[in-house]
Amino acid sequence: MKNQWKHAFSVILSIVVLVYCAALILGREVSAAGEGKITGTVKLDGTAPHMKGIDMSKDPYCVKAHASDPAHLEQVIVGANGGLQNVVLYISDGLTGSALTEVPAAEPVFDQKNCVYTPHVLALDVNQKFKVTTSDQTAHNIHPNPNPMTGNIPWNQSQPPGAPPIEKSWKAPEFIEVKCNIHPWMHGWHVVVKGGPYATTDGSGNYTINNVPPGNYTVTAWQEVYGTQTQKVTVAAGKPGTADFTFKAK
């Protein structure tokens, strides 16, 4: 009888474990199926400002790197259809729970290539680790300048050719300007958002924010010259939300 009870208990325990695992798998599948996205286009209304060519004569290496492809300022890049590149889109209201606290595992890279920052605008999450690398055979000095009142600490670090990546993270949301003390034309941004998915527009001004749970949200669009705009967006299961933005040229 004792052995029969043991056998029965083992069978019941196995069934419970199987049911629990099946529920977890089904939950993941339902969650994945229910995850939506927000898509749209960001455009400039009006004439785009002229982006001046960059004088790199201070460093012969940089001049040679752009001998066949002259470099220009990148504050405003507009595609043929009026789409704005390098606009960061993020969810500024409506997210709850783990969506606000889970830090992405991916480590984005901010590279120094041909004496410019690539990408020009790097979007990342609070506490998300990122790497600063150099592809150049000339020394650089990366100098982000956040507002210390936010909790983000400014730093200034040299990176000679062949140096290992610099690994950092930011503690608070902020639009952080990045410069190079050696090459004054080098200029970029770190856009640090507080939790949740985000996206950066491509050369045509298009973007997609993935992994958005169904719900009502406020989406913010940030551009380094034109500032921010917001829109209310609803995402339903299996149906993406849409938010198009238009900035007025100055």
Predicted feature descriptions by range:
Residues 11-24:
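Bacterial N-terminal signal peptides
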Residues 27-250:
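Extracytoplasmic copper-binding redox domains, predominantly the cupredoxin/blue-copper superfamily
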Residues 1-8:
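N-terminal secretory signal peptides that target proteins for export/translocation
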